[in-house]
Each structure stands twice: as C-alpha cells, then as structure tokens.
C-alpha cells in the first residue's frame, strides 16, 4: 500500500501543476466557453493509466475510508466545483444529495470517478421522510397514514438505485430506552417497513454498497447493520473531537452493533463567512481534528474513517481546491516518507 500511495501522490502532484491555473479562474468565470485544454490523460496516457491502476489498488487496500456528501442541486453548472469529477481522487464514496433526474454531465462525471475506483451512491433518510410527511399533514396535502406514505416513498426512492453503486440508509429516530411500550412498538413497526425494503433491495443487489448512517443504538431488533459496509455515526454537530469517542461508545454499547466499521461524520466550513460554527470545533477546523481522531488507538471499536458533509464547499479555497479535504485524507492515509 505504501508504494501505491507514493505513486499516487507523485503523479497527483503533476496533475495539480497542470490544473492549478484553471482552478483559480473558477472564482469568476462561468462555463460558457468550451476550451479544450489537454490534461495529463491526453499528454501522457501511459502515466495516467498507471496512476488510475495504483489509485484503484489503493482503494481496494486496507485504509481509512472517506465518504462525502455532494450537493448536486445545480443542473446547469457554472463552476468546476459543481462537478464530482473534480472532487479529490482519493474519495472512496460520493453520495449525491439529489439522486432523481440526473443531468447528462452528472452521468458523465460518474463514469469519470468510476475509473478512479470511487463509488457513487445516494442517501435514503427515514427521518427526512417522516419530517416531510408531518409537514404535509399540517398543510393538509397528506391525509393517509404514515405507514402507507413510508412504503410509497421507499418504493420511489429505491427506484433511483439503478443509476448508483449503492445507498446510504439514514435512521436517527429516538432512543427506545425512554419509550413507553406503545411508543416502542410503533417505532419498531416503522423501522420494519423502512429496513425490510432496504434488505429486499440488498438481497437482490448483493454486489452493491450498503452503509448505515445515524444512531445505531436507536434500532429495535434490527439486523440491518450486519449487511452494512460501514456505520456512519451522526457526529456532524458535535463541538469537539472528544465527543466522537462518546458517540462511538454509545453505539458499541447497544446490542448487535458491529464495532469494526465506525465512521464519524463531519462538515466542511460554511461558504458564509459569518458562520464560525459550521465545520469548526471551537476555532479549529473540525475536518482536520476529526481526521487526527481516526488515527488514534481505540479500545473495542475500529475508527474506520470520515464522512464529510458539504464537501463541495471546500473546493473554493484561494490557494488550493479541496485544500482541507485533501489534508484530512493525507492525515489519515499519509504518503510514505523517503
């Protein structure tokens, strides 16, 4: 793995030198002129092919994984920062936030990142479905039961899966310890509907990726976690890295939770300069601190990697696109020193 990482970083440095000037222009220029600037793949196809080979081998090796949620709401892109093809090559999994009606450029970008060994998935969130249902009931636009609504939404959203390499299923819910018997039975009923649909899909698509996101300790007699590649803990709103360990301990204390696949969630900094909280632990960047946390030893569970919210925000740095995401990846999976 060390040699593969070394080769990846050497060739990646060459790519950076070729693209750095065009990246700076992204701050002000729109994509209304198609200028065909040869990249390294055209200038030295053999070197690029070797780079891709090493990159794919690295992603198939034992390393700290990196998930990233990408806001693909813009269907007429005016910046390279709106293309997943320009996300860091070392990302393992990119989750598209808007999986329906993918544009042609998005499908092309997906093929580009596939060549780099990156999987492209999307997220189905129980909590989001429940929130939308509650809002529609208040507005008077939904009169049916939540059972029926949930089943319908699962059918619709699982229908997007054909375009993707897998899915992330999010469930936060509430802790059953504090529920009455009636509340617990209702929560389990909804969990059964949600996860049985996911398991049916997974059984028919054994080769596709399934990952859990949320609070595993809130699951009631569910076996979904054994089918999940990773468990992404809902830590994106914590205020310091010590709380990452607390969330991991809470998860591992629950019955039936595999402890060899914990990934912690973190956000990039906001594009709103006045927002000094999103993406920070105090005055420190949460992304950097969480990356260091994954490298520390732990007793009883595995710190498997990071999941990054709003990854596209980090594209817009004056000195280096995706500066802090790349730094975090290098902290977790450093290139070997000579």
Feature locations, PLM:
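Short glycine-rich, acidic/polar surface loops and turns
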Residues: 289-295
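C-terminal accessory extensions appended to soluble enzyme cores
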Residues: 51-56, 284, 295-338
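Chitinase-like catalytic core of GlcNAc-active glycosidases
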Residues: 60-251, 257-282, 301-303, 307, ...
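Bacterial Sec-dependent N-terminal signal peptides
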Residues: 1-61
């Amino acid at each position: 793995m060390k040699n593969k990482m070394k080769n990846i970083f050497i060739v990646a440095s060459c790519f950076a030198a070729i693209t750095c000037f065009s990246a700076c222009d992204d701050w002000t220029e729109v994509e209304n002129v198609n200028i065909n600037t040869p990249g390294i793949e055209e200038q030295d196809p053999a070197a690029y092919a070797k780079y891709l080979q090493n990159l794919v081998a690295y992603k198939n090796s034992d390393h700290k994984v990196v998930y990233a949620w990408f806001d693909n709401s813009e269907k007429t892109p005016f910046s390279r920062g709106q293309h997943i093809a320009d996300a860091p090559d070392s990302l393992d999994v990119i989750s598209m936030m808007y999986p329906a009606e993918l544009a042609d450029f998005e499908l092309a970008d997906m093929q580009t990142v596939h060549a780099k060994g990156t999987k492209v998935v999307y997220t189905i969130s129980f909590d989001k479905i429940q929130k939308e249902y509650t809002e529609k009931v208040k507005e008077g636009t939904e009169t049916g039961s939540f059972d029926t609504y949930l089943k319908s939404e699962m059918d619709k959203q699982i229908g997007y899966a054909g375009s993707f390499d897998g899915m992330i299923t999010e469930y936060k819910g509430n802790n059953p310890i504090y529920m009455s018997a009636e509340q617990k039975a209702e929560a389990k009923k909804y969990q059964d509907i949600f996860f049985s649909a996911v398991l049916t899909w997974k059984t028919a698509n054994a080769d596709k990726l399934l990952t859990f996101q949320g609070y595993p300790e809130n699951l009631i007699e569910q076996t979904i976690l054994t089918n999940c590649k990773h468990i992404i803990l809902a830590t994106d709103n914590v205020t310091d890295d010590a709380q990452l360990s607390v969330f991991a301990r809470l998860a591992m204390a629950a019955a039936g939770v595999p402890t060899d696949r914990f990934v912690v969630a973190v956000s990039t900094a906001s594009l709103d300069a006045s927002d000094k909280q999103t993406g920070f632990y105090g005055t420190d960047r949460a992304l950097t601190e969480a990356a260091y946390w994954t490298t520390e030893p732990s007793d009883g569970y595995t710190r498997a990697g990071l999941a990054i919210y709003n990854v596209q925000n980090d594209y817009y740095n004056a000195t280096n696109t995706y500066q802090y995401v790349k730094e975090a990846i290098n902290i977790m999976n450093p290139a070997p020193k000579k």
